[in-house]
Amino acid sequence: MATKKLNGTVIVTYRCNARCTMCNRYKAPSKPEEEIRLETIRKLPPMYFTNITGGEPFIRTDLKDIVRELRKKSDRIVISTNGFFTDRILDLCKEFPDIGIRISIEGLEQTNNEIRGLADGYNRGYTTLKKLREMGMKDVGFGMTVQDKNAPDLVPLYRLSDEMGMEFATATLHNSFYFVEAKNIIHDRPMVAKNFEALINELLRSNSPKKWFRAYFNHGLINYLYGQKRLLPCDMSFDTFFIDPYGDVMPCNGTKDKEVMGNLNTQSWDALWSSPEAEAVRAKVRHCDRDCWMIGSVSPAMHKYIWKPGFWVLTHKFKALFTKTPYSMYELKVCRDYRDGRVSKEELDRCSTCDLNCVVNNGLSAASQEQLRHKSGEEIVDADIADQLRQ
């Protein structure tokens, strides 16, 4: 009997050169000498999809070696990056032209640079995307985390990606140990939702079935930012996993604290995946109340429970035969209730994962935490990158 392939995310580093307003990971980097090695990568199971992420993955100078090993394990690989290290990205893609690249761009130029805190970050990312397309790379696209500050740029950025023939991935604010953040929250929900609504209608009017299902994902983002239960079950830790820079295998990156199923540095995959610790984490997942709506958990669920998004798509494509706006955010009861005064902003805020009094667990090892006693995360990573460039 063939082994069931999984969906995996490999967090190759917690080092990051960006200073994003919605993510404090840059303040809590991993030590390079502790980061996941090829010996551990080789122990991963067969996967139908692998996302390589960070931190900023291209800070690792051995990323090519990691991709080379993962290609033996996975049918498809997509790397999430801020696009800053253009030369490294282009060099890697020359060797591996069949991988995917998603560059985080948080809006048009001014908005992006303010949110990501990278000098000339927009132009760097945009230039990298254009050069990848000129190289003939097919699986290339934008990734945007939608929030109050950049929501008005959502549709314009989508149209830019569409003109360039690129993928366009969306997310919204989440809180977890992975983001080293507990205070993220959408303040003007109707405004943000209206921009999502406009995007959804553009996606539904397209001729691409892939975009129709992305419309459903964005419908779920509106539902999430209003603090409602997930539209689809979460099966993280059952057919999907994350592995962090220390070799710790986790169900996802959305938990308040780091939940560890086992450590692949010291265990075999089969022993780890079937361990009592893994079963204990799965029990927590079954009772998790965070209701995250991130592509890492939703995409597998959309495939597994295809009839739910499929029916939604069919319904709205039928509506699109008669109107240019087949979708309305007010299809969601909570949106109508908020509009009509039956639920308050304060009540919705309490439904979110925002916790102003939370002490965030950053998921670092003791050694990585120790280095922060003497220098800030920014100083550590800046010095690391400067040293790389000198070499």
Whereabouts are the PLM-identified features?
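Residues that scaffold the ATP/ADP-binding catalytic core of kinase and kinase-like folds
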Residues: 19, 23, 60, 111, ...
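Generic structural signal for small/hydrophobic residues in well-ordered secondary structure
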Residues: 12, 89, 103, 142, ...
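Residues immediately within or flanking Cys/His clusters that coordinate Zn2+
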Residues: 13, 17, 231, 285, ...
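Conserved alpha-helical substructure of the radical SAM core
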Residues: 1-98, 177, 350, 361-362
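Alpha-helix N-cap/helix-start and coil->helix boundary motif
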Residues: 17, 64, 86, 108-109, ...
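Radical SAM enzyme [4Fe-4S]-AdoMet core and its adjacent flexible, acidic
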Residues: 34, 69, 73, 99-106, ...
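Short aromatic-enriched loop/helix-cap "lid" or pocket-rim segments at secondary-structure transitions
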Residues: 22, 63, 89-92, 115, ...
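Flexible mid-to-C-terminal extensions adjoining Fe-S/redox cofactors in radical SAM and related proteins
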Residues: 2-4, 253-391
